[in-house]
Curated annotation (Swiss-Prot):
Coiled coil: none annotated. Pathway: Aromatic compound metabolism; beta-ketoadipate pathway; 3-oxoadipate from 5-oxo-4,5-dihydro-2-furylacetate: step 1/1. GO terms for cellular component: membrane. This is 3-oxoadipate enol-lactonase 1. This species can form two 3-oxoadipate enol-lactonases in response to different inducers. The one shown is called enol-lactone hydrolase I by the authors. PANTHER family: HYDROLASE, PUTATIVE (AFU_ORTHOLOGUE AFUA_2G14860)-RELATED, MONOACYLGLYCEROL LIPASE. The keyword Hydrolase applies. InterPro entries: AB_hydrolase_1, AB_hydrolase_fold, AB_hydrolase_sf, PcaD/CatD. Pfam families: Abhydrolase_1. It comes from Acinetobacter baylyi (strain ATCC 33305 / BD413 / ADP1). Residues 28-250 form the AB hydrolase-1 domain.
Amino acid sequence: MSEIHSIMITNRQGKTLSVQINGPENAPAIVFSNSLGTDHGMWQPQVAALKSQYRVVTYDTRGHGQSDVIENTTLQNLGEDVLDILDALNIEKAHFCGISMGGLTALWLGIYQAARFYSITVANSAAKIWTEDGWNARAEAVEANGLADLVASTHTRWFSDKFDYKNDNLAQKTIQSLADTPAQGYANACRALAKADVREKLASISIPTLIIAGSADPVTTITDGEFMQQHIQCNQFEVIDASHLSNIEQPEKFIQIFSGFVKSIQ
């Protein structure tokens, strides 16, 4: 199977998750996890570059894209959804790459489910993102007023001033995916992030870990990346000249770093 294949899988809570599979069925598997307020489409450059050599799996995080909105979401739920996807696809072990919220998911998997993964990549993320009060306030604001205000300003958080996001097709599609995200799904994810804090657990990660930070990222900073580098035993730390969605702003550089890391493990 080399062409894209889209399926809906049922997770352990009986809810559906939208999953896309590219690449040869017997090739090593890579799973990509999207950021808050986006969907699987944000990984298009990486999928295109890697699908000839790997079984590339993308999915819409619960409450995003075509996946079900699920109440009372936690970081553990986000991690267990990944395990349910692997089980549904009969993938015993995979490389996992997550950005922002997906990066926190990667950390949880590296801490609690390392046997299922060759490696984790934590891009533009942190062991604790922002503040509990900030996330809860944003969840309440989105529930009350929708996502329009966030959509209007998100380019200032996602992309650097040097990046012409208005004329970048994927950047525009990704901003539209935020507009299309169910408000309740977004709010539920905010509340999961409010409680997500794995700072005290980082030292237990023993599988190969790639940490990617954006030099102009105002959300998850180089300092956040350095903190993870200092506390995770087996890691590689890279900085990309980009803001928060480094895989969109600098897709070739992201692919170069990530593919080199994955190849070094095989």
